[in-house]
A protein has these predicted regions:
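Extended, folded cores of ATP/NTP-driven motor/assembly subunits in large transport
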Residues: 1-355
Length: 355
């Protein structure tokens, strides 16, 4: 019988400094969690709103700069509707809420996790000036949300602890939360009674990702109607919870530009159709950097699906829907526990290069 091992959460503590609740992972990197609203209504049909929200996060990346990792986590979970406690106590209000009480709906929450990386080149790696800059940058990010009229707040110590526990147990739709056993398999995880699978959207060994992606797509309903690129997640069958995890790491821009130039010369030295295509892509990226001030980043995207029953139907639905968007998922996701652990808030820095 295989020996069971204890799963250790990759955190060492939480503290509040200058009214900023900060938690630390095992490497010593420090993170905050911002809960923000998504200002775009599902059927708003407003293309400008999608671009505005996209530009907001572009500005956040530029404000933070080198040495940061950003995780945007969208939690979609099924909940049973309960009337609000502060509702009006009149006949029409009571009848209205009684009519909808108990109905299942999809609740959406958005969290932004910002992690400051500790330099590894020194024996004593903590730099108080970098830490002070991190706290100032968090204030700037909150200011960017406020300027756009978007509600955003820092989670306090208790809320951070509860959010991490909910993530570990994939439990976002019950008032009480408890940690469950995790059984790791090649193709999925079993957390308590739930079947969980992590789908990585990018395969670095194959060119299965569109070169240009808009923040929305258009569906044909007799007219061109813009919807969110992953709006199909709302209709995923046999699913209790979906976590869409997006990770962006901002490296040193000068070093990455030098690496890109070296890679271009390497491809130019071996002329064939595949290498010529790589050279064209690199030159296009260099042009965008020079003209529009774009940044070079490392990115990772994955979708975590969880359900009490068999989720193979949901996996097939998501895979087919992504294919319609021009995205072919990574077929080599056999490191399910590793992908799940790296999706935890503040732990994306541990992602391997092949993810």
């Amino acid at each position: 019988m295989k020996k069971k091992s204890e799963f250790e959460a990759p955190y060492i503590g939480i503290e509040t400094i200058d009214n900023t609740p900060i938690f630390y992972n095992r490497r010593g990197d420090y993170s905050v969690i911002i809960k923000c609203e998504n200002p775009i209504i599902q059927y708003s049909a407003d293309m400008d709103a999608y671009y505005d929200f996209h530009h907001l996060f572009t500005n956040i990346l530029k404000v933070l700069g080198t040495g940061y990792t950003i995780q945007k986590q969208d939690i979609l979970c099924k909940k049973s509707f309960l009337p609000p406690q502060n509702r009006k106590n009149d006949y029409l209000s009571n009848r209205y809420f009684e009519h909808f009480k108990g109905r299942i709906y999809t609740d959406i929450s958005t969290y932004l996790v910002i992690t400051g990386e500790v330099e590894r080149s020194k024996f004593f790696s903590f730099d108080p000036r970098r830490f002070d800059t991190f706290i100032r940058n968090i204030t700037k990010v909150l200011g960017l949300f406020a300027n756009r009229g978007i509600r955003a707040k820092l989670l306090n110590e208790n809320e951070i602890e509860i959010y991490i526990k909910r993530f570990l147990s994939i439990n976002f739709n019950q008032q009480t939360v408890s940690l469950k056993n995790i059984k790791a398999r090649e193709e999925n995880l079993i957390i308590g009674e739930k079947n969980v699978q992590c789908i990585s959207l990018v395969d670095i060994d194959e060119v299965n990702f569109p070169s240009i992606i808009k923040p929305y797509k258009e569906v044909n309903i007799g007219l061109r109607f813009p919807v969110d690129l992953l709006s199909f997640l709302h209709d995923t069958p046999s699913i209790d919870t979906i976590i869409y995890n997006q990770v962006i790491n901002i490296p040193d821009q000068r070093n990455e530009a030098n690496k890109l130039e070296g890679k271009k010369k390497k491809h130019k030295g071996m002329p064939d159709p595949a290498n010529d295509l790589c050279v064209e892509d690199i030159e296009r990226v260099q042009s965008d950097i020079a003209r529009e001030g774009q940044m070079l980043v490392y990115a990772h995207y994955n979708i975590i699906l969880a359900g009490l029953d068999d989720i193979s139907k949901a996996i097939n639905y998501v895979e087919t829907s992504l294919f319609d968007c021009g995205i072919i998922i990574n077929k080599q996701c056999f490191n399910q526990l590793e992908l799940f652990e790296c999706a935890l808030p503040g732990n994306a820095i541990n992602l391997n290069s092949y993810d």
